[in-house]
Amino acid sequence: NKLFQLPITYYTEADQWSNSPGLRADKIVTDKPVTSRCLECHTSFAEAISGPPLEPMEFDHNKIILGVDCERCHGPGARHVEFQTKNPQEKSAKFIVNPASLSRQLQLDACALCHGSNLKKTKPSFQFTTGKNLADYFTISSLNDNAVNNGNIDVHGNQYGLMAASKCFRMSQQL
């Protein structure tokens, strides 16, 4: 029930294989664990079965749905699906988060879960959902200027921090 990252990844847009994010080009690593922090963004329904609550190490692989899905941005959907299935004539979505109805900060928090790498957990994994305040679940570190200046930001770079630090973003109340 432990998960490990493959050392290479196929990028469909580029139609090529490359080193997986976070791995060095000069060393093949086959034992890099996939952590709960990875699963919070890249799966749904990950359920920890062992390890400390902040960083469990084993997961029920029968329940995990791989990839980014609707729940990442719209919150838990079971009640929504159940209601809409029983009420197909209802055209107004019920029991689901419409990100457009959230405050600017809550919209940003939903994105920052996966696009703000400088997050340190303060509550157990898999508790944050869209519509909640990210700061209640994570300590949000400021943008690391050294990483920006040295070009050390990869796919897991702090896109949220980069955007929030931009003049355009700071001068606007819109997203």
Residue ranges, per PLM feature:
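N-terminal export/assembly segments and adjacent metallocofactor-ligating motifs
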Residues: N1-Q5, D31-A48
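Extended active-site and interfacial segments that coordinate phosphate-rich ligands
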Residues: P7-P33
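Primarily the internal scaffold of c-type cytochrome electron-transfer domains
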Residues: N1, Q5-P7, N19-R24, E47-L175
